[in-house]
């Protein structure tokens, strides 16, 4: 009832009357009524050029429903209203906000992104309860000092403005956990920035920064630092002491040397692609014990040291577009799920092997790890077995590499002799690619307790039989270049599957069963006819990091796909949708996801 106290002599209905007149049709009374109950009001995308007075005064004036019912015994007690705590007025045409903002002191969330604001009202500093403020995609040129008084602020989004500097006093935001200043015109970061001791995520990408302050290492809780697309030539050595850092993005800068990270024992992802790095040495690698993703693409590397084997947790390694002519064979002993080598003058690995993908490259490198003895080709020739069918089974591959290889035979069936050759040997991989198979060999089920990798690409498969669904240790499955348009629901039993390649088939939608294989990390389904994806189901796939949807029939990309924050590689080129535009796609996955998130209706 405290909200209903009025200044002496004031007409108790006057405020309401003004509110109703000011709102017109831009803000329906039903929406205001619901907001008084829920404490949340969403006015996004209403073409507003100013905020109606009835919004600012929502908890001050007597509502319209008071006209219909003044009884204290009424079912709907209009006087028992909830203070507005969340206000969303994004995607409008607002050029300014008035100081009437102070009439909403209970606000904890204020979203005013995607407007035309050039400043913030001084009353902003009075919103002492505010925890989340989104002012992104506006026209702010000067850092709003009003923000520095918001001591309870935890999330601040100022990306896509025209800021050139950060004002003093910013360090007073001691509770800030998430700060996005990307896509501005910042040239420096003040040393006082380091006082943001609670900061967990900091995005400084797409600015004009030439350096980072040494004091950055005082941010003891920082886990995610994004400095992509700046002008950085060096990284302060103090950054190596950030013990909590897990994700570091330094792509598209001017770095010539890879920093060392002696204290960053928790670092999981290091992205330094598109720089000018010329050398990768053991000192750069030996402390990266937890690294999962290492992006070195588009640099000037000439070699990869043998010490790469120290990165035992590494899952994704991108070396594309460098000057690398050879790879250490020890690389084959890493448990990589993705290895990119395109655009290098490699002379020690045939292009045919590289085109077969990561697992084939690793197997090839492992086969070369020998201190003595004959070469692989000589050994294979000596141990190959001639079968009655005149087929040749590589016994060396079975015994040494644990591969059952009957590829590139143009066979319509896999002879029994091939499976018989396994005998008591342990087999972890099957390669029946480049044949004329119309169905999956039934005898594959005999290897269900062993096999983790299966390559059935470049065949004539139009359906998947249940035999494949019984390979419960399967982690890698290559089915590209077949005639598939669906997958059986029974594939849900493949509870260890991490990578599936369905490119160059006939799928018109992402198979439903894939959404239920929560171990999946990589889905490659380019060059099909996929017309839609379900972002809600995909968000549940928390391990999914790579999704290739290139060259399909996607007419639109659902904004909710931006919530799939675990995606590190999202490929969408070659689809007929108009948004996101090509200019967004070329910026990479992080930019695409951010673009999509900013357009989620709220």
From Swiss-Prot:
For this UniProt record, the keywords arranged alphabetically read as follows: Leucine-rich repeat, Phosphoprotein, Repeat
- Would you tell me the protein name for this molecule? Leucine-rich repeat-containing protein 40
Q: Does the keyword Repeat apply?
A: yes
The answer to whether the entry has keyword Transmembrane helix is no
Query: Which Gene Ontology terms of cellular component type are present?
Result: cytoplasm
Pfam family of the protein (one): LRR_8
Q: Which residues carry this modification: Phosphoserine?
A: 71
Q: Where are the LRR repeats?
A: 83-104, 106-127, 129-150, 152-173, 175-196, 198-219, 221-242, 244-265, 266-286, 290-311, 313-335, 336-356, 400-421, 426-447, 450-471, 473-494, 496-517, 519-540, 543-564, 566-586
Region of interest (Disordered), residue spans: 1-20
């Amino acid at each position: 009832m405290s909200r209903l106290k009025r200044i002496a002599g004031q007409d108790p209905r006057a405020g309401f009357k003004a509110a109703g007149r000011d709102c017109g049709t831009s803000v329906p009374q039903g929406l205001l009524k619901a907001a008084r109950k829920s404490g949340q009001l969403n006015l996004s995308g209403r073409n507003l050029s100013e905020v109606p007075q009835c919004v600012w005064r929502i908890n001050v004036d007597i509502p319209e429903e008071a006209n219909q019912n003044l009884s204290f015994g009424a079912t709907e007690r209009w006087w028992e209203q909830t203070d507005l705590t969340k206000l969303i007025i994004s995607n409008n045409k607002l050029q300014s906000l008035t100081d009437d903002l102070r009439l909403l002191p209970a606000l904890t969330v204020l979203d005013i992104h995607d407007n035309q604001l050039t400043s913030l009202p001084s009353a902003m500093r009075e919103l002492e309860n505010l925890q989340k403020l989104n002012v992104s995609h506006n026209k702010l040129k000067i850092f709003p000092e009003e923000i520095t008084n918001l001591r309870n602020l935890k999330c601040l989004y100022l990306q896509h403005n025209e800021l050139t500097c950060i004002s003093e006093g910013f360090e007073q935001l001691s509770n800030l956990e998430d700060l996005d200043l990307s896509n501005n015109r910042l040239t420096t970061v003040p040393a006082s920035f380091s006082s943001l001791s609670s900061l967990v995520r900091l995005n400084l990408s797409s600015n004009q920064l030439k350096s980072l302050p040494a004091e950055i290492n005082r941010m003891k809780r920082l886990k995610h630092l994004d400095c992509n697309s700046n002008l950085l030539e060096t990284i302060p050595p103090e950054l190596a002491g950030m013990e909590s850092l897990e994700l570091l993005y330094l792509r598209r800068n001017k770095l010539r040397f890879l920093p060392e990270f002696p204290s960053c024992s928790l670092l999981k992802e290091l992205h330094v692609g598109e720089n000018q790095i010329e050398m990768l040495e053991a000192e750069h690698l030996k402390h990266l014990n937890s690294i999962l993703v290492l992006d070195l693409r588009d640099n000037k590397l000439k070699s990869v040291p043998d010490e790469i084997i120290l990165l035992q947790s590494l899952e994704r390694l991108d070396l594309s577009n460098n000057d690398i002519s050879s790879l250490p064979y020890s690389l084959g002993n890493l448990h990589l799920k993705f290895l990119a080598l395109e655009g290098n003058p490699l002379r020690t690995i045939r292009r045919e092997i590289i085109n077969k993908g990561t697992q084939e490259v690793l197997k090839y490198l492992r086969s070369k790890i020998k201190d003595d003895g004959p070469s692989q080709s000589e050994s294979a020739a000596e141990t190959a077995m001639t079968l009655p069918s005149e087929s040749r089974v590589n016994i060396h591959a079975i015994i040494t590499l644990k591969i059952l290889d009957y590829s590139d035979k143009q066979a319509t069936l896999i002879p029994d002799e091939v499976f018989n050759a396994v005998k008591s040997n342990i087999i972890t991989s099957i390669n029946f690619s480049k044949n004329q198979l119309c169905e999956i060999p039934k005898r594959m089920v005999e290897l269900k307790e062993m096999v983790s990798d299966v390559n059935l690409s470049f065949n004539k498969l139009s359906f998947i039989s249940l035999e494949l669904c019984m390979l419960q240790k399967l982690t890698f499955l290559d089915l590209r270049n077949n005639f598939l348009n669906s997958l059986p629901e029974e594939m849900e039993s493949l509870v260890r599957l991490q990578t599936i390649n369905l490119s160059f088939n006939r799928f018109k939608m992402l198979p439903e069963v894939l959404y239920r294989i929560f171990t999946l990390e990589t889905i490659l389904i380019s060059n099909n006819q996929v017309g839609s994806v379900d972002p809600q189901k995909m968000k549940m796939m928390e391990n999914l990091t790579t999704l290739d949807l290139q060259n399909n029939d996607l007419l639109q990309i659902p904004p909710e796909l931006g919530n799939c924050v675990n995606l590190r590689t999202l490929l969408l080129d070659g689809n007929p949708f108009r948004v996101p535009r090509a200019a967004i796609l070329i910026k990479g996955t992080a930019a695409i996801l951010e673009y999509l998130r900013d357009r989620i209706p709220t």
